[in-house]
Amino acid sequence: MIITVINGSPRKNGATSKVLTYLYKDIERLIPDVKINYFDLSEVNPSYCIGCLNCYKMGKCINQNDKVEYIHDIITKSDGVIFGSPTYGSSVTGLFKVFTDRAHMMLERLLYRKPCIAVTTYENARGSKAISFIKSMVLDSGGYVCGSLSIKTGFNQNPITEKVESKIQKVSKKFIYCIEEKKNPPVLSQIYNFIAINAVLKPMAFKDIEQYKGIIDRWEEQGII
């Protein structure tokens, strides 16, 4: 079992990191031979997407100067993915958004049928906005959220309370179950993706096969077409 964890916080040892670390260590406790790939985006420091659409044509980002394309390929091989971000300005961090732009996840359906966990931390309010962004990103990338954690905590405080531990343990068990049992995505998620692929994405891509060759090749690899 291969799990990839993405920490979208600029603070490497902040509250979001603590929640993600507890979560993946609990998964390791339950599945000792699991392989965890953990990435701090603050270390990756991804460059902005420049909108060149090379990923549509060639199936990879033209910018090879950071680890974003490497992480993209690791996610492709993963059985499940955990995404985390603190709440900044009523949403995810700019760092997290830059990564999702660069990783060309959505059109190619990078998370196709993969179970995911959405994690956010917040101090006062709007944690629901950040978690909503992550959930939408997962759905729009072909995956589904089988568990989420929205943790209220103060600045520089340890978010891991007894109550939070219990929540994390429940989410990790469900996540493992979804992976091991190869659970189908929820029906509404399947319907959404069916419509997105067949009514929107395929007509667009096959109208200009040369421009979207990289996307079409990825769909074939995933068994989407």
From Swiss-Prot:
Q: Which domain of life is it from?
A: Bacteria
Q: Does the keyword Aminoacyl-tRNA synthetase apply?
A: no
KW Ribonucleoprotein (keyword) present: no
Amino-acid positions noted as binding [4Fe-4S] cluster in the UniProt annotation, renumbered to this chain: 49, 52, 55, 61
Cofactor list = FMN; [4Fe-4S] cluster
Q: Do you know which SUPFAM superfamilies this protein is assigned to?
A: Flavoproteins
Q: Which UniProt keywords apply?
A: 4Fe-4S, Flavoprotein, FMN, Iron, Iron-sulfur, Metal-binding
GO molecular function per UniProt: 4 iron, 4 sulfur cluster binding; metal ion binding; oxidoreductase activity
Cofactor note as given:
Binds 1 FMN per subunit.
Summarize the subunit comment.
Homodimer.
What is this protein's function? Redox-active protein probably involved in electron transport.
Describe the family membership recorded for this protein in Swiss-Prot or TrEMBL. Answer: Belongs to the SsuE family. Isf subfamily.
The entry's protein name is: Iron-sulfur flavoprotein CD630_04720
